[in-house]
Amino acid sequence: SWRKMATAEKQKHDGRVRIGHYILGDTLGVGTFGKVKVGKHELTGHKVAVKILNRQKIRSLDVVGKIRREIQNLKLFRHPHIIKLYQVISTPSDIFMVMEYVSGGELFDYICKNGRLDEKESRRLFQQILSGVDYCHRHMVVHRDLKPENVLLDAHMNAKIADFGLSNMMSDGEFLRTSCGSPNYAAPEVISGRLYAGPEVDIWSSGVILYALLCGTLPFDDDHVPTLFKKICDGIFYTPQYLNPSVISLLKHMLQVDPMKRATIKDIREHEWFKQDLPKYLFPEDPSYSSTMIDDEALKEVCEKFECSEEEVLSCLYNRNHQDPLAVAYHLIIDNRRIMNEAKDFYLATSPPDSFLDDHHLTRPHPERVPFLVAETPRARHTLDELNPQKSKHQGVRKAKWHLGIRSQSRPNDIMAEVCRAIKQLDYEWKVVNPYYLRVRRKNPVTSTYSKMSLQLYQVDSRTYLLDFRSIDDEITEAKSGTATPQRSGSVSNYRSCQRSDSDAEAQGKSSEVSLTSSVTSLDSSPVDLTPRPGSHTIEFFEMCANLIKILAQ
């Protein structure tokens, strides 16, 4: 949902503009609707790119009616080679789109500085770009301004397509009449003012990008614009001798003047040059994607995000109205799940770039990680235990014996909301240490002792978060670590139980003060020993983890 600023639309922070939790910095670029600035999280230092859309310009272009639902859908886009939209902040004068920031700069600048890429590297980047284009086309979004300036590179030289954000949703029979984009990359039908449907113009632009990767120059270029237009409309371009004949045939098919004869994504995917060394995760297969079965979880998520009824969504699906934003959102959710599953399998079997999923890190010692949204930015360290914001202030803290984790590319707030929902469903009690750090406990009905664990959300990289499960052995460890209140009663009464009222919870907190000590002493002087057997705490911890993971996976 769009977040409204409660006070002034722009707040000053030490002379700098602040939007939400982000301090705006240098301008990264200027577009049709406004500027793109780098933003830095005021607490963590995490960088984002903030696109500023001027409401007056949006009104003048008559796109107010569709931009809200379109942006809502774009927030669902999750693809390893498309810049992600994290958050939208709305003010009376502007709309701020908080997006993924990558450090490698534009592909355009890289080519200008380093010249053409070798064939293998060109193919690798082109495969990534086409995968992103295909993902958006299947969800009724056309870019219309693909060019090396809109392809960004991350720290590992992987492609990230930017600026899908303001493209129109495609509809059958609805042609995109707006001639936009850079002439050098524009298809003949665009510059000549003819009607065009959308996907085919992205294919042309992708062909120009492929040529630039392989040759270091543009296929159509001239300082005199009328001459440039003639070259594009003639479709004749120079092919250097060093080019592979196979890739020349692909380029000629993609840069076909007649859009009806131009290559489709299916044609490109089946081309022998493109298929070589193609990672499976870029085009995952899913036999259930076109299934007529309705996914209840996806249906529920669409209703929550769009504040609509199930009947509205089902009506779009049953009527096969695939262009409706509700239907697009539904298929996006299912598609995201499919892509993540396929990508996980791929990355477990290969050595992937660090920029996507990072599941291979699970087999190595913990790398440096930065906690998300904590009160301070700690020094770089090497274990999850040391990175706990409270524990880091204390020396000699014993490392937890166990840690488990779930990785996700969802937004941090969404992850924690799902975690709290699952905890509530399991009837566990929990205490909020900070919005991204919870302590959870479950009472053993036999021994009346509590099994306790902590849940901490960590940021692994700019796209991935790790929900860390840690066993809490005893109250003494908690008190020393600074994560619990020194008084037992204070610690207990701060736990939340969804089944009780506040007064009931307070009464339970007082009575539980005794039961907390029952793990080491009996409730009275009788010889009954309720001390858990060695290892039982570990077993109960794993049971808690398993129950929670099962709910989260539903």
UniProtKB/Swiss-Prot annotation:
Entry's EC annotation: 2.7.11.1, 2.7.11.31, 2.7.11.26
InterPro entries noted in UniProt: AMPK_C (IPR032270), AMPKA1_C (IPR039137), KA1/Ssp2_C (IPR028375), Kinase-like_dom_sf (IPR011009), PRKAA1/2_AID (IPR049020), PRKAA1_UBA (IPR028797), Prot_kinase_dom (IPR000719), Protein_kinase_ATP_BS (IPR017441)
Posttranslational mods: Ubiquitinated.
Gene Ontology BP terms: autophagy; cellular response to glucose starvation; cellular response to nutrient levels; cholesterol biosynthetic process; energy homeostasis; fatty acid biosynthetic process; fatty acid homeostasis; glucose homeostasis
Biased composition (Polar residues): 480-500
Residues with Phosphothreonine modification: T27, T178, T264, T350, T363, T377, T483, T485
Pfam families attached to this UniProt entry: AdenylateSensor, AMPK_alpha_AID, Pkinase
Ranges of compositional bias, category Low complexity: 511-530
Gene3D superfamilies xrefs: DNA helicase RuvA subunit, C-terminal domain, Kinase associated domain 1, KA1, Phosphorylase Kinase, domain 1, Transferase(Phosphotransferase) domain 1
Regulation of its activity: Under physiological conditions AMPK mainly exists in its inactive form in complex with ATP, which is much more abundant than AMP.
Top-level EC class as recorded in UniProt: transferase
The protein's required cofactors: Mg(2+)
Primary localisation category: cytoplasm
PTM-bearing positions, type Phosphoserine: S351, S355, S392, S462, S481, S491, S503, S519, S522
GO terms for cellular component: cytoplasm; nucleotide-activated protein kinase complex; nucleus
Function text: Catalytic subunit of AMP-activated protein kinase (AMPK), an energy sensor protein kinase that plays a key role in regulating cellular energy metabolism. In response to reduction of intracellular ATP levels, AMPK activates energy-producing pathways and inhibits energy-consuming processes: inhibits protein, carbohydrate and lipid biosynthesis, as well as cell growth and proliferation. AMPK acts via direct phosphorylation of metabolic enzymes, and by longer-term effects via phosphorylation of transcription regulators.
Protein name (Swiss-Prot/TrEMBL): 5'-AMP-activated protein kinase catalytic subunit alpha-1
Organism: Pongo abelii
